[in-house]
């Protein structure tokens, strides 16, 4: 056996459970977040494991036993890969529901996890539904907290929230389409939150299904070593079961809904393929696991248990993903995935969770999942229920009891836990207490998404979730006079969803809502109509432009106002310059020598800078990547005050901005279009018409995927054009990439339009 096979590259995994992208970072021109930086930035999983092992020493046998039974699992995938159908089968086989219902509500019931009418009609998952269920494996009972997440790009925040509090995930991939654009996005999110995953290749009963092509794509596109632990028995419509490669046994689903598992000998015609794929599994594991590598070099045949242990180690180390296969709709191959969740994904004691000690200069603290420790929990999702605000909480340390008082670390407010529930989609079951590692929900707690709660004895804060900036806005006006329901709905949606923003434009007297895409905003307008009986008229979708500068400009501005009695006086001198590092956002600095401007006036200058950046001088959009330095100035003994310096700063900024070769920046989107091969020419023509830059083309045997970069301003109405060009068979996804300067003629048009609007006022 060739020793060269073992020349693998050492793993460089991002350590820690908390994302290595700092949450205060500006993402491709997004505005800064007032979130904590990442509490953990370790370079290797090995270092992380040392800390996890140290923490395990502090756990009692009861804690270890309780954690061993727990799995916090998310289900993520590209839209229409069959996540919700898969979850429906999981709930049925774990006896949480008594009958299977299909997505899109075809049987007038709809999938259990799609609890909103809108979800059942559109056949897409909008919110992450949380539920828990039990699974028996080899005589032991395991408790799963299960979260079904949306696959549509516009609902990315729901996926982010789910992954932030989970310990592992099932990545569902379509056997026909393979790795798609949103699969790549979900993979990036899993890496950001260091979530290990088991992969399930779904829709094996569909024509054109090819699981091994999908596995190749996992390796090449997602850059994660992946190998099959099963192969299918039969293909497409003749799919009848799977072969377990590790145990060399065939698994069949019998009964009306596949609830009975039968094991038998492997069909003779599949034995050569089974041995080939089993060997490939061992070789792939040898590349990522040291113990398996030694056995491989010594040419020893690993036992079944040794293979399972190697898969578990490398999956938890996030250096490998085992691949299972089946069809949720055909009730085939789901129970082995539940066994794989138990066998290969971590329990809460095997994951490092870190907080910041606010009382000790934000020092990092490793949380211990023991019930005797002080309580620490994260509110990761809010919902408005019929009994008031429902807050989803992940307990990281200690226990949460009904009737206990808990403290919001951010606000310092103490609140009583009046009711504690476990969620089953939109239904709930009351419980008296939950221990560390569990996910629960509570009522009557006023907080924001991402707030940390403790029992008051410690002041720990969890790092918050990364929130992408909104890229599409539209004006919205209620038809009815029911203003109270309109504002109630907007307030609720904002609290529930950090990517949904609302502002009132005093000039146009319109309410502007902003979000992640057209569908995102459409869903909220529709929810307003259904849940609050508020019909709205919406304007045309608007692009969220940004304004910036390209060269430095000095300023020396004096603000004077005399109106009898005390007047106003403030003078500021300095420089306005572009920020080269887009991760820093807008920067305000002072370098005043000798106290020529007192600190309280400088603070007012800072406020003026923040305010003027919200509405740029060119077209009234937010300013991006600009640094303002005030290094001199003057005050008047009587007339100077905070307002004078705030006004002087704002006027100086506007004046210097217009002299610094300003540019208007527009959002550039990553576009992925998938369509049958016969429409390839039409789709390329359509993208060329939009002046898109085509980056990559992938041709499958019956469909192709085009990846391109395109200005968002040209993409409105693209769904309709694509439907027309592909006879309704094409699909696409959009994701924000970066901001780039608009073409000079577009900039001229935008400025001219803005000036006309201003002149009318």
From Swiss-Prot:
Occurrences of domain tr-type G (ranges): 68-349
Pfam families hit by this protein: EFG_C, EFG_III, EFG_IV, GTP_EFTU, GTP_EFTU_D2
InterPro entries registered for this protein in UniProt: EFG_II (IPR041095), EFG_III (IPR009022), EFG_III/V (IPR035647), EFG_IV (IPR047872), EFG_V (IPR035649), EFG_V-like (IPR000640), EFTu-like_2 (IPR004161), G_TR_CS (IPR031157)
Superkingdom assignment: Eukaryota
Alphabetized GO MF terms: GTP binding; GTPase activity; translation elongation factor activity
Residues that, per the record, bind GTP: 77-84, 148-152, 202-205
GO terms of biological process kind: mitochondrial translation; mitochondrial translational elongation
Keywords: Elongation factor, GTP-binding, Mitochondrion, Nucleotide-binding, Protein biosynthesis, Transit peptide
Transit peptide, UniProt annotation: 1-42
Pathway of action: Protein biosynthesis; polypeptide chain elongation
Localization: Mitochondrion
Residue ranges crossing the lipid bilayer per the database entry: none
GO CC, alphabetical: cytosol; mitochondrion
SUPFAM superfamilies: EF-G C-terminal domain-like, P-loop containing nucleoside triphosphate hydrolases, Ribosomal protein S5 domain 2-like, Translation proteins
Entry PTM: The precursor is processed in two steps involving mitochondrial intermediate peptidase (MIP) and mitochondrial processing peptidase (MPP).
NCBIfam families membership: EF-G (TIGR00484), PRK12740.1-5 (NF009381), small_GTP (TIGR00231)
Family: Belongs to the TRAFAC class translation factor GTPase superfamily. Classic translation factor GTPase family. EF-G/EF-2 subfamily.
Function: Mitochondrial GTPase that catalyzes the GTP-dependent ribosomal translocation step during translation elongation. During this step, the ribosome changes from the pre-translocational (PRE) to the post-translocational (POST) state as the newly formed A-site-bound peptidyl-tRNA and P-site-bound deacylated tRNA move to the P and E sites, respectively. Catalyzes the coordinated movement of the two tRNA molecules, the mRNA and conformational changes in the ribosome.
PANTHER family: ELONGATION FACTOR G, MITOCHONDRIAL (PTHR43636:SF2)
Other notes: Present with 6348 molecules/cell in log phase SD medium.
Protein name as catalogued: Elongation factor G, mitochondrial
Organism from which the protein derives: Saccharomyces cerevisiae (strain ATCC 204508 / S288c) (Baker's yeast)
Gene giving rise to this polypeptide: MEF1
């Amino acid at each position: 056996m060739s020793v060269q096979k073992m020349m693998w590259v050492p793993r460089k995994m991002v350590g820690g459970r908390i994302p290595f992208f700092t949450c205060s970072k500006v993402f491709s021109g997004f505005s800064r977040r007032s979130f904590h930086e990442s509490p953990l930035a370790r370079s290797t999983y090995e270092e992380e494991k040392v800390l996890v092992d140290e923490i395990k020493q502090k756990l009692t046998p009861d804690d270890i036993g309780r954690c061993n039974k727990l799995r916090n699992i998310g289900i993520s995938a590209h839209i229409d890969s069959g996540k919700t159908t898969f979850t429906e089968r999981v709930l049925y086989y774990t006896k949480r529901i008594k009958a299977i219902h299909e997505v899109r509500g075809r049987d007038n019931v709809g999938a259990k996890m799609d609890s909103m009418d809108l979800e059942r009609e559109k056949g897409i998952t909008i919110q992450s539904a949380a539920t828990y269920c039990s699974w028996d494996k080899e005589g032991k009972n395991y408790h799963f907290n299960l979260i079904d997440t949306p696959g549509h790009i516009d609902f990315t925040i729901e996926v982010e929230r789910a992954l932030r509090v989970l310990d592992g995930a099932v990545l569902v991939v379509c056997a026909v389409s393979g790795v798609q654009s949103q699969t790549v996005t979900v993979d990036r999110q899993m890496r950001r939150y260091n979530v290990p995953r088991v992969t399930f290749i779904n829709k094996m009963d569909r024509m054109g299904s090819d699981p091994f092509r999908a596995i190749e794509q996992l390796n090449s596109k997602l850059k994660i070593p992946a190998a099959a632990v099963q192969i299918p028995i039969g293909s497409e419509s003749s799919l009848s079961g799977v072969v377990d490669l590790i145990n060399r046994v065939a698994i069949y689903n019998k009964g009306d809904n596949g609830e009975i598992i039968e094991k038998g000998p492997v069909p003779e015609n599949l034995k050569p393929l089974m041995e080939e794929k089993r060997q490939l599994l061992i070789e792939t594991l040898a590349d990522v696991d040291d113990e398996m590598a030694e056995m491989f070099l010594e040419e020893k045949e690993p036992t079944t248990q040794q293979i399972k242990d190697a898969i578990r180690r490398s999956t938890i180390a996030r250096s490998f993903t085992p691949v299972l296969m089946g069809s949720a709709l055909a009730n085939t191959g789901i129970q082995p995935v539940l066994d794989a969740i138990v066998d290969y994904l971590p329990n809460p004691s095997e994951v490092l969770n870190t907080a910041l000690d606010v009382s000790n200069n934000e020092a990092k603290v490793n949380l211990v999942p023991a019930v005797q420790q002080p309580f620490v929990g994260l509110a990761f999702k809010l919902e408005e229920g019929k009994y008031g605000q429902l807050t989803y909480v992940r307990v990281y340390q200690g226990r949460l009891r009904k009737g206990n008082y808990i403290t919001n670390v951010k606000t310092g407010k103490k609140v009583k836990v009046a009711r504690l529930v476990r969620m089953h989609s939109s239904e709930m079951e009351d419980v008296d207490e939950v221990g560390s590692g569990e996910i629960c929900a509570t009522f009557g707690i006023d907080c924001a998404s991402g707030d940390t709660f403790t029992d008051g004895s410690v002041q720990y804060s969890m790092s918050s979730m990364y929130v992408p900036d909104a890229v599409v806005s539209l004006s919205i006006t209620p038809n009815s006079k029911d203003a109270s329901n309109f504002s109630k709905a907007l307030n609720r949606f904002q609290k529930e969803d950090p990517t949904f923003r609302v502002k009132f434009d005093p000039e146009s007297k319109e309410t502007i809502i902003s979000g992640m895409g057209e569908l995102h905003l459409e869903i909220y307008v529709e929810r307003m109509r259904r849940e609050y009986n508020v019909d709205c008229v919406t304007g045309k979708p608007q692009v969220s432009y940004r304004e910036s500068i390209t060269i430095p400009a000095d300023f020396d501005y004096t603000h004077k106002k005399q109106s009898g009695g005390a007047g106003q006086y403030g003078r500021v001198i300095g420089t306005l310059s572009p920020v080269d590092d887009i991760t820093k956002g807008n920067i305000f600095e002072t370098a005043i020598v000798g106290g020529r401007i007192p600190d309280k006036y400088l603070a007012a200058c800072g406020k003026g800078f923040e305010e003027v950046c919200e509405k740029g001088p060119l077209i009234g959009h937010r300013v991006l990547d600009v640094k303002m330095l005030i290094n001199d100035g003057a005050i008047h003994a009587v007339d100077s005050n905070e307002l004078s310096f705030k006004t002087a700063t704002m006027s100086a900024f506007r004046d210097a901005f217009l002299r610094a070769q300003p540019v208007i920046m527009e959002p550039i989107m990553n576009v992925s279009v998938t369509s049958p091969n016969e429409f390839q020419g039409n789709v390329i023509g359509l993208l060329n018409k939009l002046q898109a830059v085509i980056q990559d083309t992938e041709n499958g045997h019956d469909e192709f995927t085009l990846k391109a970069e395109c200005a968002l301003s040209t993409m409105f109405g693209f769904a309709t054009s694509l439907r027309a060009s592909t006879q309704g068979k094409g699909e696409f996804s959009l994701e924000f990439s970066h901001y780039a300067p608009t073409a000079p003629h577009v900039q001229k048009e935008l400025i001219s339009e803005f000036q006309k609007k201003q002149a009318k006022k």
